[in-house]
Every structure is written in structure tokens, then in C-alpha cells.
């Protein structure tokens, strides 16, 4: 039987994780291993300075595992402890509450970080996310609205089934799926590339009661981007974005140009 590892960065009890499990549970044996709490924005960080604990939990009547660390930690423990070092046939990360579009989020998202970790072992990975109505909902499980996962579940199941049957296209490690707010079964699906930015980075300085400064990193959304990008598809066109990702970050350039650059050093 095929085995599917499911994880996320919103925590083991997040409704999106439950939705992801339900979406693929008829495709094989599902092993759900996820952080014990909210760990958004931690990227692919690994806990190397503290021990990890893992607890068996009940998730809708089925066994799952809560990990004290990051999404990447969860993938590692899922593969090397729960699965005894045997690789799953597919890894699913999500369904995340909060769109993971542009290089800004792909390089900082715990959802994507978990998918990258799975892909590093040769496991095909799918990351699925839905757009939020309020950016604060990305970091707080007490959401401003009730998010519906039906469309995301149906799409995730179809994509997962196809990947299990055919494998990933050559050169693709991860499929990053992002659904706009209020997507339906009729919403158009487009294949996109990553936009460069999603936030206009800003730093807000505040003062504590003793007058010492502290800082919040934030910034306004960039909702207008070039044609063919994930940001444009989701924000401007209201389409479902599917971005093929590779974990090989090597720039696709003529190495001779780099040698020419180095010759002057």
C-alpha cells in the first residue's frame, strides 16, 4: 500500500491538516506528523540545539503524531522514527491557511520548508495553501473568518492521485498549490512562476515601558506583479496557482560568464 506523509506548519490540530488527511486518505496509508502548535514562518529550520519530543495523539479517531519542533523536524521524525527510515510515496504539506506565493514566502514558509525536506530525500511533495481574508490569520489559529477547504481538498486529492500514478515531471520536486479566497470547482488553474516579492518590507520601532526600542518586521502586500507569476494569478486574476519548484537553487546561467567574473579577482 502506498504511504503518504502529511504535515503542516499550523499545528497538528489545525483544520487544514485535518482537511489534507481527509483529502488523501483513500489513496493510501496516511501518516500525519506535525508540530504540536503554530510554527508558521520558520522555513526549513531544524532543531539542533534542543531535544525533540513526539507524542501520539488522536486526530478524528485516527493515530497521529505531535512534534515539539518545526515542520521540518516533523518530516524528519515522521520518516526516520514513525516510518523507521522507509520513505513515503508522497508528502503533503498543508492545507495552509495563508497563501505561500513569491520567493518571499517560499523561502520563509514552514509549509514549504517541510515539503523541501521531504523532497531532499527524493520524495515527491505537494504544498497546498489557501488565501486568507486577513493577513493576521496566517499566524493565529483564531481566524477572523471560517475558512472552507472543500475546493482545496478536491484539487489536492486529484493532484496527489496523479502524482502517485505518474510521478513528478522531470526536474520538479514540489508542486506549490495556492487557491484564491472563495475559489470554487470552476476556478481556473494556471501554472505559474514565483514572483520576486509579496511584501514591501517595513520595520516599525516601538518603545517598552523603560524606553528601550524593540522592533516589528512587517510591510504592505504587493498585489500587482508581472504576468505569469503566482502573485498575479492569485491576487489580480483570482486563479488557482500551481508553481513547480525544484530544490536545486543553482542559477541557470552560462558558467563561463561566472569564470569570466572570477578572472578579475
Swiss-Prot record:
Compartment annotation: Cytoplasm
Function, in words: Nucleotidase that shows phosphatase activity on nucleoside 5'-monophosphates.
Could you tell me the EC number(s) of this protein? 3.1.3.5
The record ties this protein, via InterPro entries, to: SurE, SurE-like_Pase/nucleotidase, SurE-like_sf
Q: Which domain of life is it from?
A: Archaea
Xref: SUPFAM superfamilies: SurE-like
Task: State the organism of origin.
Answer: Methanothrix thermoacetophila (strain DSM 6194 / JCM 14653 / NBRC 101360 / PT) (Methanosaeta thermophila)
Q: Where does a divalent metal cation bind?
A: 9-10, 40, 96
Hey, which family's this protein in?
Belongs to the SurE nucleotidase family.
Q: Which UniProt keywords apply?
A: Cytoplasm, Hydrolase, Metal-binding, Nucleotide-binding
Predominant place of localization = cytoplasm
Per the UniProt record, one Pfam family is: SurE
Q: What cofactor is needed?
A: a divalent metal cation
- Which EC class is the enzyme in? hydrolase
Which reactions does this protein catalyse? Answer: a ribonucleoside 5'-phosphate + H2O = a ribonucleoside + phosphate
Recorded protein name is: 5'-nucleotidase SurE
Q: Name one GO molecular function term.
A: nucleotide binding
Cofactor binding summary note = Binds 1 divalent metal cation per subunit.
